[in-house]
Each structure stands twice: as structure tokens, then as C-alpha cells.
UniProtKB/Swiss-Prot annotation:
Residues 630-665, 987-1050 are annotated as: Disordered. Residues 451-600 are annotated as: Interaction with RAB38. Residues 994-1007 have a biased composition (Basic and acidic residues). Its main location: other. Residues 1-372 are annotated as: Sufficient for GEF activity towards RAB21. The modification Phosphoserine is found at S962, S970. Keywords: ANK repeat, Cell membrane, Cytoplasmic vesicle, Endosome, Lysosome, Membrane, Phosphoprotein, Protein transport, Repeat, Transport. This is Ankyrin repeat domain-containing protein 27. The gene is ANKRD27. Residues 658-707 are annotated as: Required for interaction with VAMP7. Gene3D superfamilies: Ankyrin repeat-containing domain, VPS9 domain. The keyword Plastid does not apply. The modification Phosphothreonine is found at T1023. Residues 396-460, 692-746 are annotated as: Sufficient for interaction with VPS29.
Amino acid sequence: MALYDEDLLKNPFYLALQKWRPDLCSKVAQIHGIVLVPCKGSLSSSIQSTCQFESYILIPVEEHFQTLNGKDVFIQGNRIKLGAGFTCLLSVPILFEETFYNEKEESFSILCIAHPLEKRESSEEPLAPSDPFSLKTIEDVREFLGRHSERFDRNIASFHRTFRECERKSLRHHIDSANALYTKCLQQLLRDSHLKMLAKQEAQMNLMKQAVEIYVHHEIYDLIFKYVGTMEASEDAAFNKITRSLQDLQQKDIGVKPEFSFNIPRAKRELAQLNKCTSPQQKLVCLRKVVQLITQSPSQRVNLETMCADDLLSVLLYLLVKTEIPNWMANLSYIKNFRFSSSAKDELGYCLTSFEAAIEYIRQGSLSAKPPESEGFGDRLFLKQRMSLLSQMTSSPTDCLFKHIASGNQKEVERLLSQEDHDKDAVQKMCHPLCFCDDCEKLVSGRLNDPSVVTPFSRDDRGHTPLHVAALCGQASLIDLLVSKGAVVNATDYHGATPLHLACQKGYQSVTLLLLHYKASAEVQDNNGNTPLHLACTYGHEDCVKALVYYDVESCRLDIGNEKGDTPLHIAARWGYQAIIETLLQNGASPEIQNRLKETPLKCALNSKILSVMEAYHLSFERRQKSSEAPVQSLQRSVDSISQESSTSSFSSMSAGSRQEETKKDYREVEKLLRAVADGDLEMVRYLLEWTEEDLEDAEDTVSAVDPEFCHPLCQCPKCAPAQKRLAKVPASGLGVNVTSQDGSSPLYVAALHGRADLIPLLLKHGANAGARNADQAVPLHLACQQGHFQVVKCLLDSNAKPNKKDLSGNTPLIYACSGGHHEVVALLLQHGAAINTSNNKGNTALHEAVIEKHVFVVELLLLHGASVQVLNKRQRTAVDCAEQNSKIMELLQVVPSCVASLDDVAETDRKEYVTVKIRKKWNSKLYDLPDEPFTRQFYFAHSAGQFKGKTSREIMARDRSVPNLTEGSLHEPGRQSVTLRQNNLPAQSGSHAAEKGNSDWPERPRVTQTGPGHRRMLRRHTVEDAVVSQGPEAAGPLSTPQEVSASRS
């Protein structure tokens, strides 16, 4: 409702009410009623004591209100509806509401309304309803601005001094300069706390913009308008020549209707005031008043819609010819190019379009003194078409530029901005910069007054520069172009926001990093006291928070408060952004600072989880304060492990104090990089390591970074040069791809630990050492296997990482994978030749660890690949000794080794195919998403009472039919017959069968007859591979019933 504001204590109507009827003031306070007060601008004359003040005092009754003299009034939304008792049932807008108290602390409300309740019929009243949202005179502006105008005067004085030096610059330069002055003054005005609150309402913001524009232009009018007049002098002379030749033109010659002739003298007098107006806004108001006068009839006011476009344009044509204004072109140029407070789409813009169309019609020579019958209407049609075209052309050159920036059209943006370069080329061709000879005048005359030229300093009606728009729309590719063209990185809009503010508000990390690279200040506060970090925390953009903090913690000012005293940590805690809170606390944000409500970030946390995180850091913060020297000592101890690229000699030459500072700085930079890798923040990693787009595009062309082979260490031949360049490249920040932290962790190590499969190829491509060890002598492959990150393990192995390296505990990657139960990783390691029976410092093999951790599938996989069950650890225990009795693992340890041993005489290739056919393609399958079936092959044990003499078990190995059998043997054999082999004659049959197929590439599986359904229980599953039924070990002697090994092909 509060779209308009004024001091009601100075309102003439309210003052008259207090003066003439104090009894009504007392009564309305006693009954807590409502007083209706017309706004100041709607009161045409002094208020008389005979005014019916009772009609403006409202008393609530049931569902409506009554005045003190018994008239009905309804309040519906933001309008007053007059009811019974009033002669005219008007609807009056409510502008705002205030509550007043008298000396007895009795309250009553005042509703400021747009105009009085009585209908006005006198033609002497204002021509249109008073617009409370516009300022008309410089006196109104000075009253509105108050003391703020004194601050503007200093900026204006500076503008006067610099204008003389740039007088020969182009029109666009002066447009941008005047706009910059306007923006600076508006920013100063919006720093006022009261006006800042009002500015949140669009109408109030427009009022402030009008006030600043009128005041600024009034003070620089002589400079700017004189310059524009000089630029448009030749155009004005040509137009004046035409209008002078039409002085005999009569109204009837151009079809002016008689009903509109009456107001032409008044409109002519009003139009003559145009050159007395000192701002575009005032000139437009003058033109609007002319149009209103034209449309007013002698008896009553009529709306603009009652006059058609032809009627209006006929009158305007007559006024343009008959009014003595010699500089119409200068006025048009001034109004169009120096109006900053609003767009051309409002009522004032329509009035300007009408005059512009009429002027263009006259310039074309279409107007003559002939009667309309002989003139023809072809030219009139042109007039209407021109007016329609002008009304549609609402986009200024600046608007066009901003649209192309928003859409990322780099080619068009570059074309528009390169127009200014032509002006510079023209100046270079002049005799000298101040030359006025004919040749030099021809060079510059066509470009100096061209308003279509745009620059990186052009602004829209929000105060945004092109760089603001690029940041707001996330167009990182245009940041470089705009900065190279001279865009001001720290330019501020009307609300004090820089491009960095907008990028952080919208969450564009790449834009944020680019702006920081071009020295954008992270310390700038907008009108609300917010830094870019405040906005990134408010909107929860973790990536932007990290970009600001990691770039430079000191310049980011983590503990600065906004106008409410809130630090970024207050905001992140209030909205529950845990990751942002941790980032801020890790980099030194204080949890002790209080805002203006005496709240610490801890008190702002409304979430119990966030509160626990804050409290944990709060306790550590207190401990750090008590022992502040500990971190420095720790850093000093690890000076040599912070960066592989550091220079030992430079550190040794420093003093102890400077060494600690350098160590602290290097450590912080490394931690930034490692945290970005841990978070998978590719943009931040790229920025810190200074990778380019080409580096990412070539990511798939990763070469091995493990011991690259060169012709000689310094070889630069075509084969060695790419790898040499990659290994030698170190960013200017000193951060290399193999830099390490205190504990020896490198970026590749952290990426492997956190499973960042997208970063691993990039790190390896840029020279990361896959064989580098940390403080525990572990390589990245150890960590990836321990955490079960299959894709990371695959990438490292494909880059020739060694699968059998041991750490300080003697553990290999295979032992870690088996201990964690990561059967997919185990299969992959075995395929790459991992040693299966290697022991760690405790003597445990991979099989020991899998048995101890009870990972059934891993145990089966190891056994099928020949893991020994006889190896003793340092406690003299085998894997069988570590297994629980009567468990599935125990049955596996007893059954599978004998089954595998029975196949020892089979050809090696066939045996591998037989037991690992499913494992080979594990990493290429996407069918293992179900949590209850993590690996394709599962074992089921079914006990049969009639087939075994002793305690035996039967194992059925079922496989998923949806996974194709892609072994090399299966590709050559379109159909494989089911075979059956008895255990007692397996070697002999295998040998004879191999002899028969001596010329075959792949020996066939020993033939085994498949048992019928009545002889065994088979768990039904879709299968592609062979199902193996193995016999358990014989404890007391040979089994009475031979155990059959059967393979079924589905």
C-alpha cells in the first residue's frame, strides 16, 4: 500500500483539520477511528474552515465505515469506495497508512488518499489527476532530497572540471560520463537507511531516481545541452529551413478538427516552455502536458483514447510548425540519450514517440500547405507507419548490447563494442586531435554524434554495466572480452553491487574466479553492507564461497558484518548450510562475533545438526586461542613436506619468523587444493592448477605418468616433448600436480581416497605420479582399493600403477580390497596380475583378511584364482583356522581348493576361462546395482541326505543370464555342448580330449554328463555361464558316490 510518502505533519489538509476542528482530532483518537487525508499534490488551494471535515473522519460499523456526518464508506483493498450520502460514488486510491498518538497515548490511523472526496468540475482544476509519483520542478526535487543535495554538489563540481578536458569526445562518452555521475549520486542517496527501506517499493525507487536525475541534469544542463546542440546543429538548421517555409500553413490544410482547435493556443504556450526545462524528465512532462491540453475539451476533460492517432498527429504537426523552437533535433537527442531514470515504455515515452514521428514526417518533406484533398493520403500513411514503428522500437542500443551479452552471443557483442575503435582510428588520421580543418571535420562528424555506439561503460536503468549483465547471466566466456575492452571490474550499480556480488548471488563459480583473477575486490559492500561472501552464503552457493575463501582469505574478510551486524557465518548458520559453515570455520571465521541483536552464529543455528558442528568448532576455537603457538610449531616441523616444488635454499636463508610465515602460507595454499579435490570441485582445481579448456578436452588422451620413458632426461623430440612439457609445467602460484601436504598426501592421493573418478584422468594427464607414497608409504592405489572405488582403481591400473606395492604395514592393494569386501575391485586386481599369496607384516594373506572379515564372495574368488589355504601367518594360523566352523566360508575353504586342484591337468587357458569367465568383464557390466546381489556369481549350498556318506555339501554356482559370455572361447564356439566328467577319471579324459583337438585354438571343457532333476536340487536362476557343482574334501576316505561336476549351458 505504501507507494507514496510525505510528511503528514506538514500536509495542508491535516494542518487545517487541527487548526479549525481540534474537537474532531480528539474524538477520532478516543474512538480509535480513521482520518482520511488527501495527499499534498492533490490540494489545489488553501483549505477553508467551511470544508466538510466530518466526511473525512471514519468510524467502524459492522462490515463497513461511516463518516461523522452519516455517510457510508467501504475500504476494499487499497481503495476507498464511497457509498450512500455522497453525491458522486468515487473510488479513491489509498497511498499509505500511518498510526498517530496524541498526548494521552490514544491512537488513531491516518490514510493518505490520492485526492479529495468531492468531485471536481471546474475547468480551472488541474488537467489530470495529480501524480504523486513524479516530481515536476527543481524546487520539489530540492525539498525531496534535503541534505543529500549537498553531497551531490561535490560530485557535480568534479564533473565540471573533467568535462572541459573531454569536450572533444564522442556523444557516447558524454552519455556514459553523465550516467556515471547519476549512478554515483543515486548510490549516495540509497545509503540513507530510511530511503533504503522505501527503495524496496518500485514506485518509491522510481521517485528517487527521478529526483536524482532532475537535480544532476539541472546542474550540468549548460554543459551537456550545449554540446548536444553543437552536435545536432546541421540537423536543426535543415529542419528549421523546412518549418520556416510552412509558416502560411493553416489548420484546415492539415485536417485539424474544430473541436481540437480551441486548445491549440494553450498547448502552444506550454510547448514554448520546452527550452526552459533543464532535464529530460522535465522536458517529457512538458510534452505530456501539451498532449493533455490538446485532448481536453472546453466543457469537460476527455481521455486520450477519444482522440484517434490521426487527430493527435495533425495538431502536433501544426504546433511544430507554428511554435518558435529552433532546436528540435537537439531536444530529441537530449531527451532520448540522457534519460536514465526509466525506460521508454511508459506514458512519457509514448508522448515522445508521437512528437518524434511528427518531426520525422516534416523532415521527409511530406508536409505542404495544399488542402488534404489534393495532397493524397499516401504520405499520411507513412506518418502512421512511422509512429507505429517508433513505438515498437523501444530497445535502445544499450538494451541490444545487454541482450546479446545475456544470451552469450560473443560475436555480436564484439561487433558492437568494436564500433568505438573506429572512432579512435578516425582521430589518429586527423592532423592533430584538436584540428578543425575540413578534412578532419569529415572524419569525425559522422561518429561524434552517433548514439548507437555502445561501450563497456554503458548502463541500463538498473545501473548495470555490460560486465554486470555477463556476471548476472553466468557468461564466463564474455568476461575476458569485456575486461579487454576496458570494462571496470569493480563498477557498482544503483544498489552498490559489483559484478562479483551478482556472480556470487547467482552461484556462478567460474565467473567468480575470473573476476577475482582480474582483481575484483571481495571487500566491497553494497548498500545493505553485504560483501560477495555474504550473498554467496545467503543463497547457499558453496562453490562460490570456496572460490572467495580459497582465493585469498585475508581480502575476503570472513568476519565483516553487514548493516544488521551479521557475518557470513551468521547467515550460513541461520539457513543451515553445513558445508559452508565448515569451510568458513576451517579458514578462521570467528564463532564469537555478535550481531546487532547480540546473537552469535551459535545462537542463529536452528538445526540441531548444525548446532553440534558449530559447538565442536567452537570448542576447538577456544583451545586454539589458549595454545596459539601449536599450529606454528606443527607447520615448522613439516616445512619440507608441503610442496615438492619448494626451494630448499630459499627457506634456509630466511629468518625463523619469515620461514614460519612462508610455511603457513604454502600450507594454506596446498590445503585449498586438496579440499577442492576432495570435494570434486573441478572448476576450483582447474583454477588453482591453472588448467585451460584444452586440457579438459584432451582428458581422454591420458598418458601414463608413472616413470615416463624418455630418450634421455632432457629429450625434446616429438615423442618426448608433450610429456616433458606436462611434467615441467608449474602454475605461477607454485602449486604443482604433485604437491603434498604435511602427511604427504598429493592431489591424486586425495582424489583416490574420495573416489573422484572424473579428476583422476586429468591429474594423471598433467603428470601426477601414481607411484608416489605418503607418510605411511601408501600409494593412491592402496586408498582406492581400501575404499572400494572401482572406477578409480581401473583408471590407476590402466595408467600402469603397480598392483603389488606394500605400505608400512606390508599391505598390498589386494589385501585392502579383500579386507573391505570389495569383490569387484578384487577381481580387477587379479586380472591385472596382483600377487594372491603375498603376506603383510602380520603374515596375513588376502585370503586371511577375507576370511577374518567374513566376505564370502571374496573368499570364493580368491580360491578360484588359486589362493593357498596352507599359508601360515605369524600366529601360525591358516585361513581355515580363522574361519568359523559350519559356516559357508568353511565349506568354501574345504570344497573349492579340491575342485580347482582337480582341474590342474586341464590346459591353462581353458582353466582360466572356466573359473574367471565372469570376472573378466565385470567392470564393463552395468547390471550390479542391486544391493542384495553385489556380484554376479553367488553360491548356494544345498545338502542332500542320500548322496553323501559323511558331512558334505553341494555348491551350485548360478550366474545372471542378462550378462553375455564374452570370453574369447565363446566367440569362436557358437554352441558349447554340455559335458560331464567324473572326478576319478578327470585327468585321463582331459588328456585324451586335448590330444584329439591338438590343432584347436581353445581346448574344450572336459565332457560331463548332466544329472537329472531327480538326483539333485537345482536353484532356478537365469544363467549364461556354467554352473559348477564341486565336491567337498574327503575327511575319512573316498566318497561311496562319486561327486559329479556338471556344467549347464542355457
